[in-house]
């Protein structure tokens, strides 16, 4: 008998130890018997499920797990699609009773100091909010009665003081509790009144922005606070220029080192933010972050990281603020007669050439034939390449386009007209790069080039400072990011990329702005 009792005692102790190592949250939600309740955590604006339980006929159930839940703000999600928040800290064995009629009023907590102080503070705020609303209505009714207005304002002020005192007491009494740290994280930094200059106030605010919000405190990622806090800093407090943003992003990412969860979130968040951003400067940030940190992304596959590295290597060649790669092209003649003289040679190309396939054993020989035929063709455009870098101009607009593109058909005539009327008057030259089809299919290339000829002739796209360019061997597809047509790049006189992937009208506005800034600088 003693042995049996001993075994039962040991079993009970081991069960208790197992429970202490994991979580056991007993719930009773009135009015939803035999229904499902979800336990989950906040992750910025998302609700992430962690566990489910089906309540019994008494509306009771237990969430159990062998591993402890990470500290943070959690929720209980009900079949009505309503939910109420709870906190998970180090002590994860407790009970919660509630009623669907009023979550805050009917909440009962047993065994969790964290949730009790959370609930008490919520009640205080709720009561203060109701009082404040009543006083606001009374203040409106008391307009014109100065004594009454002042009396009401004092009462409103006392409410704020009461809430502030509750916060200070909470922080002093439970300094190491998650809820105290969460409350502190919700509070904005206060700029000392002694700092009166607005610029100084801004820089103080920025320098101390994260004082109440430690970026390396992992539980904050399981709240609604983390991402909005970072977004506000990046969007509102940082200079929106590539070099500044790169520096700020590095600071944010490095602040999270030492915690894999935070490091992964911060890197992924900033990487995706600038990968999707349509601002032409955003790509500089995306490329820099990917180049530095991609190899550290232990959670990504090698194939994914390899693909990212290839994209980064390509985009490095065409970043705004960086020198562009040169374009070595052949120029289409500037009159219809000489263009028509080229048509027999593209007909000959079609007759001589045949489609080639890499799988065929004679691929290399046929590829050599392709090169010979294309060399013969482009030599009839002229025997020397035109270097875009070597053409002197204050501004150089490079547009990649093709005659089958419906948007190109609309934009290219407009661009040519705008060039003749406006762009050429401010020292801008245009390099219209024809994007040919695959050189492995001469039939398709023949058809496509004829369309190019037809379009240029019909629109009479001939003018001094306007260059119609072509070169099937040029590596522009590797050196310029052209995922759609037409795509515009704007270079300065030193061939540095100053804008890309915006309309030619926007580029014109930028050129005007730069010219005006230059004139102002001269006048100083």
Whereabouts are the PLM-identified features?
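Bacterial Sec-dependent N-terminal signal peptides
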Residues: 1-28, 434, 500, 517-524
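A non-transmembrane, solvent-exposed segment enriched in polar/low-complexity residues
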Residues: 21-175, 182-212
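Coil residues (strongly favoring Ser/Thr
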Residues: 36, 51-52, 100, 244, ...
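Thiol/disulfide oxidoreductase modules built on the thioredoxin-like
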Residues: 186, 471-515
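A recognition module on extended beta-rich or small alphabeta surfaces enriched in W/G with H and D/E
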Residues: 198-244
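N-terminal targeting signals for export/organelle localization
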Residues: 243-371, 523-524
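Short active-site neighborhood of thiol/selenol oxidoreductases, capturing the structured segment around
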Residues: 344-352, 357-365, 371-416, 429-433
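Structural microenvironment flanking redox-active thiols in thiol-disulfide oxidoreductases
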Residues: 409-458, 473-477
């Amino acid at each position: 008998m003693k042995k049996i009792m001993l075994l039962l005692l040991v079993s009970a102790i081991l069960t208790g130890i197992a429970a202490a190592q994991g979580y056991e949250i007993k719930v009773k939600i009135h009015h939803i018997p035999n229904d499902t309740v979800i336990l989950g955590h906040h992750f910025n604006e998302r609700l992430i499920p962690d566990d489910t339980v089906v309540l019994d006929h008494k509306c009771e159930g237990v969430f159990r797990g062998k591993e402890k839940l990470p500290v943070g703000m959690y929720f209980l999600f009900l079949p009505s699609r309503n939910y109420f928040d709870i906190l998970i800290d180090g002590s994860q064995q407790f009970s919660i009773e509630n009623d669907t009629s009023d979550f805050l009023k009917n909440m009962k907590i047993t065994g969790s100091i964290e949730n009790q102080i959370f609930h008490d503070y919520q009640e205080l705020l709720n009561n203060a909010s109701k009082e404040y609303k009543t006083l606001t209505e009374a203040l409106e009714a008391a307009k014109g009665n100065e004594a009454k207005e002042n009396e009401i304002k004092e009462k409103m002020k006392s409410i704020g003081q009461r809430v502030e005192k509750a916060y200070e007491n909470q922080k002093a009494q439970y300094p190491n509790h998650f809820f105290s740290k969460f409350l502190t994280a919700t509070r904005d930094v206060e700029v000392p009144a002694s700092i009166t200059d607005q610029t100084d106030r801004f820089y103080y605010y920025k320098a101390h922005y994260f004082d109440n919000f430690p970026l390396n405190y992992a539980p904050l990622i399981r709240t609604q606070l983390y991402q909005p806090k970072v977004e506000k800093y990046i969007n509102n407090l940082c200079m929106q220029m590539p070099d500044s943003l790169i520096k700020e992003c590095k600071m944010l990412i490095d602040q999270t080192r030492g915690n894999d969860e935070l490091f992964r979130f911060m890197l992924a968040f900033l990487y995706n933010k600038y990968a999707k951003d349509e601002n032409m400067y955003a790509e500089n940030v995306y490329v820099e972050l990917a180049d530095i940190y991609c190899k550290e992304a232990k959670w990504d596959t090698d194939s994914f990281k390899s693909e990212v590295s290839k994209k980064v290597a390509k985009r490095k060649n065409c970043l705004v603020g960086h020198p562009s790669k040169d374009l070595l092209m052949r120029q289409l003649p500037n009159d219809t007669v000489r263009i028509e003289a080229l048509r027999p040679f593209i007909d000959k190309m079609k007759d001589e050439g045949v489609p080639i396939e890499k799988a065929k054993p004679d691929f290399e020989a046929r590829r050599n034939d392709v090169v010979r035929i294309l060399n013969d063709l482009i030599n009839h455009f002229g025997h020397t390449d035109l270097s875009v870098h070597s053409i002197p101009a204050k501004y150089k607009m490079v547009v990649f386009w093709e005659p089958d593109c419906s948007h190109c058909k609309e934009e290219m005539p407009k661009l040519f007209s705008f060039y003749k009327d406006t762009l050429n008057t401010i020292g801008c030259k245009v390099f219209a790069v024809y994007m040919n089809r695959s050189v492995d299919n001469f039939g398709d290339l023949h058809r496509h080039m004829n369309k190019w000829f037809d379009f240029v002739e019909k629109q009479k796209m001939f003018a001094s400072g306007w260059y119609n360019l072509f070169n099937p061997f040029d590596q522009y597809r590797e050196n310029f990011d052209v995922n759609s047509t037409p795509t515009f790049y704007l270079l300065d006189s030193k061939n540095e990329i100053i804008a890309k992937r915006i309309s030619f009208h926007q580029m014109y506005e930028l050129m005007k702005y730069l010219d005006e800034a230059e004139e102002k600088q001269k006048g100083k």
